[in-house]
Amino acid sequence: MKINVHAGHNPTGKVACGAVGLLDESTENRNVVKELKAILEAEGHIVYDCTCNNGTSVSDVINKIVAKSNANTVDLDISIHFNSGANDKIGNGKSCGTECLIYNTSNNKEVIAKRICANIAQLGFKNRGVKIRTDLSILKETKAPCILAE
């Protein structure tokens, strides 16, 4: 398979960086992208890192990721994020755990998203499941089927 992967948000310290608290989302999602890319390549997949590190706003970061992603002809697009967990160890019961967001259930996205959630949940995180989100540009505007993993 050919796969795009990207860390959501700008790097830490820049505008539009990710959640901070117990973990720093912008740092950790980049670590995950690096490891995920290496694992997928070791399995024989072609992987493109479409992370944006120089966005000037939230919309600019998203637009740059979408442009990089759409420049590649791939089978799947995966955006890596971390739920904020309400910025504490206990969380608020609403944003804690893992979930995958998809635009719709076509192109086998739901099946893959369920597998991602199940595998992350095996690490001890609450499995919040797969959710349809039609309002997120990253899911709407990428040409390839896209999964946003939280």
Regions found by a protein language model. Name each.
Residues T12, N107-K109, S137, C146:
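A broad, structure-centric signal for solvent-exposed, well-ordered loop/edge residues
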Residues L76, R128, P145-C146:
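Structural motif
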Residues N54, V58-S59, Q122-T142:
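Short catalytic/ligand-gating loop segments at beta-alpha or beta-beta junctions
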Residues N107-K131:
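Active-site-adjacent substrate-binding region
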